[in-house]
Amino acid sequence: MNATQEKLKVQLEQALVAAFGADFAGVDPILVSASNPKFGDYQANVALSLSKKLGKQPRAIAGAIVEKLDVSEICEPPEIAGPGFINLKLKTAYLEAQLNDIQADPRLGVPAAKTPKRENVDFSSPNIAKEMHVGHLRSTIIGDSIARILEFQGHDVLRLNHVGDWGTQFGMLIAYLREVYPDALTTANALDIGDLVSFYRKAKQRFDTDTAFQETARQEVVRLQAGAEDTLHAWKLLCEQSRREFQVIYELLDIKLTERGESFYNPLLSGIVEDLEKSGLLVENQGAKCVFLEGFTNREGEPLPLIVQKSDGGYNYATTDLASLRYRIQQDQAKRIIYVTDAGQGNHFAQFFQVARKAGWIPDDVELVHVPFGLVLGEDGKKFKTRSGDTVRLRDLLDEAVSHAHADLKTRLQKEERQETEEFINEVARVVGISAVKYADLSQNRTSNYIFSYDKMLDLKGNTAPYMLYVYARIHGISRKGDINFKELGNNAVLLQHETELALAKYLLQLDEVISSVEQDLLPNRLCEYLFELSQKFNQFYDRCSILQAEEPQRTSRLVLCDLTARTLKLGLSLLGIQVLERM
C-alpha cells in the first residue's frame, strides 16, 4: 500500500466510525486501485461487505460513509457507483505536490522500514572443486536482489555463501591427487578450475568402482576431520583455487557475499545430535539417528525420518543445516533467515525447519523463509544444457551474453553510421549483456521455470533490460541535447496538464508500494513489472508531449518528470543489481 493509499485508508476508517459508531473501528475499508481510469484512481468496497450486518442497502451505507469522509485535500468529491462502490479520483494539485516532495528526496518517497531487523540471506552456495553452472545463476541473482532491497529498506543484512567445502568429496579428490598429481596438494595455483573439475570426475568414477580406493578416500576424510597438517593444507589449497574462480563470476555479476561454508559448522555437529538426544526427539533406525516428522511419509505411507547421524557415525546436510540455523539465531541474532534455493529442496527445508521447531530452537520472533525458484530451460523446453548434453558453465553463459550484446551493438552502430571507441563498445556490451541475463531471470515469477533465450533477453523492445536501459539513456540524451543539469531544476515546478503526464505522475508515486511488497513477499519480478510499466508510460509521455521545445513553465515541469523517471529507473534497477548507462 503506497503513502497515498494509506492516507485514504485512514480517512475511510475514521468515516466508518463517525457514520456507524465505535463498533466499526478497525473495519477494513477494502480500498483497492481502480480497475479502470473511468472509475477514478481508488475504489472502496466496504459498503457491500457491511450490508448484511447493518441491514441496509450498500448505496445507502456508501452515502453515509461519504457524508463523513474528509479527503478534500487529496481527492475530487467522492462518487458512489454501481451497487455501492466509493470511487476516489486524486486531485491534480495533490499529485503535483507529491511529485515536488519526492524530487528533493534521494529515496524518491520510499520510507525506510519502521522497525529494521537483522536478516540473513543464504544464497549462491556453490561447491568447492566444481564449477559454477547455470543452476547457480538463479540463486545468486535472486538472493542478491532480495538482499539489496532489504538493505535499502534499512535492515541489517548478512549475505551468506554456504559453500560446499566439506565431506566425502574431499577425501576422494585428495586421495586421487596424491596418486596422480601430488604437487596440486602442496603448491598454490598448480591447477585451474577446469583441471580440478576433471580430476574430481575421475576421482568419483574411481570411488564408485574401486573398494580399496573408497577406503583410502575415507581415511583422508578422517585425517581432514582430525586436522592432519598435510591433508588440511591440501584442503585449503583446493578451496582457495575454487574461491578465486567463484570470485571472478561474483565480480562480473557485482555480487557481495560473506563466505561461511559447511566446514565452519563442523565443530558444532556433535552438539546438535547431543541436544536432539536430550530433548527426546532422536530415534535410532537401522543404526542411524533420526527425527520422525509430521506430514512426511514415503511411498508406502510410512513416516519419513530426517537422518541427523548416519549409521557409520558420520553427519549429513541436515545436521549441518541444523547447526547453521541454530548459529544464525543464537550468534548472528537474525530475526528473519532467508534461504534462496531451487524448489526441489522444498521438502528438505520443511523437514529441518520442523526439527528445529520441535527442539525449541526457533524463538517466536524469528521467521524462517525458504525462497524457492524454478528451472532454467533451453529453447527446446528441456533443462538448459550444452549441445553435448553437459551442464552449462555459468562463466560461459555470461561471456556469451556479453558477446551477443557486443555483436548487436556493432550492427546497430553500422546502421546508424555512428563511430564509437572500442572502450565504449566493450563497456556498453558488458553492461547490456550482464543486465540482460539478470533481468530475464528476475522478471519471471521466481517459482516458475523460464526459457533462456539470448535473442529475447537482448531485444530492445519488450520487457527486457535493454529496453529500460534505452529509456534511461534517452532521458540523459534529452539533458545533453538541451544542455540541462537535472539537479538545477527548480523546486515546486511540476504542473500536470496532459493525460500522459498525469498517468506518468501517478505511476511514479507507486514506487514505495512496490518496494514494500517485494520486501514482504520476496518476489523481485514485481519490481521488474513496475519498471517496465514506468518505461512504457514515459515513452507514451515522450511521444505525445514536447519537452525541450515546450514553453515555460511547462518545459521545466516536463524536465522534472524526465528526471524523476530516470532516477526511479536507476534506483529500481540498482535494487535488481543492474547498472545503467547514460549513452548506448
UniProtKB/Swiss-Prot annotation:
One of its GO terms (cellular component) is cytoplasm. It is an enzyme of class 6 (ligase). Disulfide bonds: none annotated. One of its GO terms (molecular function) is arginine-tRNA ligase activity. It is found in: Cytoplasm. The keyword Ribonucleoprotein does not apply. SUPFAM superfamilies: Anticodon-binding domain of a subclass of class I aminoacyl-tRNA synthetases, Arginyl-tRNA synthetase (ArgRS), N-terminal 'additional' domain, Nucleotidylyl transferase. Gene3D superfamilies: Arginyl tRNA synthetase N-terminal domain, HUPs, Isoleucyl-tRNA Synthetase, Domain 1. InterPro entries: aa-tRNA-synth_I_CS, Arg-tRNA-ligase, Arg-tRNA-synth_N, Arg-tRNA-synth_N_sf, ArgRS_core, DALR_anticod-bd, Rossmann-like_a/b/a_fold, tRNAsynth_Ia_anticodon-bd. Pfam families: Arg_tRNA_synt_N, DALR_1, tRNA-synt_1d. Signal peptide: none annotated. It catalyses: tRNA(Arg) + L-arginine + ATP = L-arginyl-tRNA(Arg) + AMP + diphosphate. A motif ('HIGH' region) lies at residues 126-136. Keywords: Aminoacyl-tRNA synthetase, ATP-binding, Cytoplasm, Ligase, Nucleotide-binding, Protein biosynthesis. One of its GO terms (biological process) is arginyl-tRNA aminoacylation. Its EC number is 6.1.1.19. Monomer. Belongs to the class-I aminoacyl-tRNA synthetase family. This is Arginine--tRNA ligase. It comes from Nostoc punctiforme (strain ATCC 29133 / PCC 73102).
